[in-house]
A protein has these predicted regions:
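Generic enzyme active-site microenvironment
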Residues: 9, 33, 86, 126-127
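S-adenosyl-L-methionine
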Residues: 45-77
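Short glycine/serine/threonine-biased micro-segments
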Residues: 13-16, 85-86, 130
């Protein structure tokens, strides 16, 4: 089925198309979809052959490697022509599960998304993520010593988790090992307290809002539950 609404959609972090299917069902015409995982794109195209029929550009370039101006020229669209930009930016670093590394490279991918928005200037731009994004912060600036300290500590935490899982299987966790974990946890707490007092430790949501407003967009933020829109699960997204 070909799109017939006249509206266009440009989506990044498309995955296998969980969000994109909504636009297809509403007969949006897909101009561009991006994900760096080939199998995701193959699944998306297999389930939606109309994407090829309509000439959608299927791109597996990592979003932080995209030349936005060159892409706009390749697509042959003008500034402000695209109706909707949608990006479910990677959420691993913002999820309430896990260690939430403050310098996780994935935490900064929204900058690449907003660079695309700045170059294309769509009529509507949507960034979707987990509710944990509301409390997420990232470290900016060039304090290499602090970054190195964070990287080493978070690597030690990951190594400890892996070793703990292995020892649990053979019932070999002892008090000394548990004390090591408590020490790492305390070091993490102290480091996070230091970060909270740093002017370079900034709110992700406030940074996104600032960047949008600098481009002239009016920003609305809310947490939506997928069950409100017919999904079989009660899953909240921002």
């Amino acid at each position: 089925m070909s799109a017939n609404t006249g509206y266009t959609i440009f989506e990044t972090f498309v995955g296998a198309g969980g969000s994109h299917i909504g636009f297809i069902q509403e007969n949006f015409r897909t101009v561009y979809v991006n994900d760096f995982i080939d199998d995701c794109l193959k699944t998306l195209v297999y389930n939606n052959p109309n994407l090829i029929e309509e000439g959608a550009y299927i791109d597996n370039t990592s979003i932080d490697k995209i030349d936005a101006v060159a892409l706009r020229n390749k697509l042959g669209v003008t500034i402000g022509e695209i109706d909707v930009f949608f990006g479910g930016v990677v959420c691993k670093g913002f999820s309430l599960a896990g260690e939430r590394n403050p310098i996780d490279e994935r935490n900064y991918l929204y900058h690449a998304q907003l660079n695309l928005v700045n170059v294309f200037r769509p009529k509507i731009s949507i960034i979707e993520n987990v509710p944990g994004m509301r409390n997420a912060k990232v470290l900016v600036g060039d304090d290499e010593d602090l970054r190195s300290e964070i990287e080493k500590l978070w690597q030690a935490l990951e190594n400890y988790k892996g070793k703990k899982a292995a020892l649990r299987k053979i019932n070999k966790i002892n008090k000394a090992f548990e004390d090591e974990g408590k020490t790492l946890k305390k070091r993490k707490e102290l480091l996070l307290k230091r970060l909270q007092n740093s002017p370079n430790y900034i709110s992700v949501v406030e940074d996104i809002k600032r960047l949008y407003e600098e481009m002239g967009y009016t920003v609305h933020m809310d947490v939506l539950n997928s069950a409100w829109y017919g999904a079989a699960t009660k899953r909240s997204e921002e």
